[in-house]
Amino acid sequence: RYSSSAASDVYKRQTLDLLVLLPIIFWAARLTRNWIISWRGFEHEDFRYIDLKNTNRLNAEFRNFFGIHLFPTLIVNFCLYPLIFIFSNNATVTPFLYLASLFTFMSVVLETVADEQMRDFRKDPMNKGKTMKYKLWKYSRHPNYLGEIGFWFGIYFMGISSGLAPMWIILCPLSMLALFVFASCPMMDNRSLENRSDYKEYMEKTSQLLLLPPKN
């Protein structure tokens, strides 16, 4: 009886680990693939660093360290905090965990599909300087960001499925949502407004994040 009970516990533990880790591994693999595909060599410099050069040196170094590197890193680590509760010894596999794992996985699918659609659009030389406003991008200006936000809410959902997490950890995914809504999305919108003449009209008609029908 003891052996059977121990085997059952091991199976439940392995099931829990798989439900939590598979969407995270998928998410990490997507990021790694994106980096490999988009890497242009050591001489390439991200536009954010180029923009920083237009400010004074002290301000540039401050924004580089805190704004581009430290703060987002802290947010990511903070948003991973709910996993502590799902990996505790008292956590069990629940139907809600299955749903949360599926939600997390599908969020990564959403951003992966959005990335591929944008990549295919940019491959066509005829689209240079034009705005992508087809497929998922017809309904959201940043469907890839929507998927990323969904991923972090999925981490939160998996954490609370344990029944052990405090209520305040809702702040974890909300902090990531705020980062995208008030920083990442506006930054990309402003850059697109500067570089694409048709982006203003697209921006006025298209939802920032949620997949919604375009405005008339």
Model-derived features: where do they sit?
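Transmembrane alpha-helical segments that form the membrane-embedded catalytic/substrate-channel core
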Residues: 25-43, 73-78, 101-122, 172-192
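Membrane-proximal soluble regions of multi-pass membrane proteins
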Residues: 34-43, 127-134, 191-216
